[in-house]
């Protein structure tokens, strides 16, 4: 039921949102060792990215989509749903472009929304990603049942892939803008 009824959990601080706060504090501490601050920076960047990938903020008794086997409508290769959202569609979006070119495209497209995206906290941002997972990533799957991972390989329709390719770039842009904001305010 975690997917259908979002219940934020953070058992003993073992969650990304708590760790983001922790790593931000270490990074801001000028008395912390260089090694500790460098590790905090690496992990902060990783965790901030993770909370913007919807399947990192949700679970349908399927290990965040890792147990859901899917195929794209264009092929026969089998992937996990998590892999499709984390890697396959992102690579398709970027294509043969250089990463900095794609990043500049995201900036140009989404810049008018940047200030609005800075409202809230990592907990709220993770909750927003969870809603996206609930309403789009999972609920739009063929044969979706809340709380039950599919037993068969699902084919992701052209429509499903098209819609995913509309929200994934925005999630990447949000992650980048929020990361820049946190780093700039922490390291000023």
Residue ranges with predicted function:
Residues 1-47, 54-188:
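N-terminal, motif-rich segments that launch catalysis or mediate targeting to/interaction with membranes
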């Amino acid at each position: 039921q975690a997917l259908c009824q979002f219940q934020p959990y953070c058992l003993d601080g073992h969650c990304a949102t708590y760790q983001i706060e922790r790593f931000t504090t270490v990074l801001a501490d000028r008395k912390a060792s260089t090694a500790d601050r460098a590790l905090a920076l690496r992990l902060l960047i990783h965790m901030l990215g993770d909370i913007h990938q919807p399947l990192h903020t949700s679970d349908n008794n399927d290990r965040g989509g890792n147990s859901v086997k899917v195929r794209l409508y264009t092929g026969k290769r089998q992937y996990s749903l998590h892999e499709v959202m984390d890697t396959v569609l992102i690579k398709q979006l970027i294509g043969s472009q250089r990463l900095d070119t794609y990043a500049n495209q995201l900036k140009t497209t989404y810049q008018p929304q940047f200030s609005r995206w800075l409202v809230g906290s990592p907990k709220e941002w993770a909750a927003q990603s969870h809603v996206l997972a609930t309403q789009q990533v999972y609920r739009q799957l063929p044969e979706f049942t809340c709380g039950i991972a599919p037993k068969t390989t699902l084919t992701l329709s052209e429509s499903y892939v098209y819609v995913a390719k509309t929200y994934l770039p925005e999630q990447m842009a949000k992650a980048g803008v929020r990361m820049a904001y946190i780093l700039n305010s922490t390291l000023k």
